[in-house]
Design a protein with these regions (language model features):
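Pocket-flanking alpha-helical
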Residues: 27, 47-81, 158-159, 179-184
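Short helix-initiation/N-cap motifs at beta->coil->alpha
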Residues: 18-21, 42-54, 148-159
Length: 265
């Protein structure tokens, strides 16, 4: 995925990721940092269950897309004795929820009554957040008669843009590590019943033996810590048309104090 002018003089690190924005961005960042330290980095896109299997079998060295303890809890349970869980690089900031523009005079799901024609604008059917929203419609008595409208993430983004331009009411399904939070003034609605789920962490997972085989790379992966805001800032640059590799490099260059903590010995 990446190129580096200088000749790598260390080993090759193999990273796996799924085709999700948060995994792509975090993999890009840690790959470029490893390359700066002299490693050659190979990245492979796999389905989520296969990423776990590949790390557990030692077919790849690491991944940065482990949502724990809930979303990937079943995958983790299957292989937890065959991997090293290096802990969160995003600590308890990954969440799903119902999101509205800040100009709307509602702060909780319980405040909803007839806003936006009793419609929640969602994404593709089958996504986890779609199921959570359907559970929320059942959990809150004030949402009786409401419905979730599903099409695509792009269509939801277009509806959000239109609504904000006109200062119309809109309720969308939202999640942290998404560029819309950097572009618009949005807020999560409180979820006292917890039907949208709790905030999770995104962890780095390494294969057994990587610590002994490549101790410096292992240490960098172990030290990798940043925030949802960091991640979303890169996503926004890419959404605005910047080349992903360039957007990643610029973030690294502008956050040397943070990156230096990952690479310090």
């Amino acid at each position: 995925m990446f190129s580096d002018d200088k000749e790598a003089n260390k080993g090759t690190i193999k990273l796996a990721y799924a085709q999700q924005d948060d995994q792509i961005v975090s993999t890009n960042v840690i790959a470029q940092v490893l390359e700066e330290q002299g490693y050659k980095v190979d990245t492979t896109s796999l389905d989520i269950p296969v990423t776990w299997e590949a790390v557990s079998k030692g077919e790849v060295d690491a991944m940065t897309g482990a949502w724990l303890p809930i979303t990937h809890g079943a995958e983790y349970k299957k292989v937890k004795n065959d991997i090293d869980n290096l802990g969160p690089h995003i600590d308890k900031e990954a969440k799903l929820g119902l999101v509205v523009p800040k100009y709307m005079d509602v702060n909780s799901i319980e405040d909803l009554n007839n806003q936006a024609n009793k419609k929640i604008t969602g994404i593709e059917p089958g996504a986890e957040i779609v199921d959570a929203t359907n559970e929320t419609l059942k959990a809150y008595p004030n949402l009786k008669g409401w419905e979730q409208i599903n099409s695509s993430t792009g269509a939801m983004n277009a509806e959000l843009k239109r609504a904000i331009k006109n200062k119309d009411d809109i309720i969308i399904t939202g999640w942290n590590r998404y560029w819309i939070f950097q572009r618009y003034d949005l807020k999560y609605l409180d979820d006292p019943k917890g039907s949208m789920g709790k905030a999770e962490s995104i962890n780095t997972i390494a294969r057994k033996g990587l610590k002994e085989d490549e101790p410096e790379a292992y240490r960098i992966l172990d030290n990798f810590k940043w925030s949802v805001k960091d991640m979303e800032s890169i996503m926004l640059e890419i959404e605005n048309g910047k080349d992903p590799e360039k957007a990643t490099k610029e973030w690294i260059d502008n956050n040397r104090d943070k990156v230096d903590k990952w690479t310090e010995k």
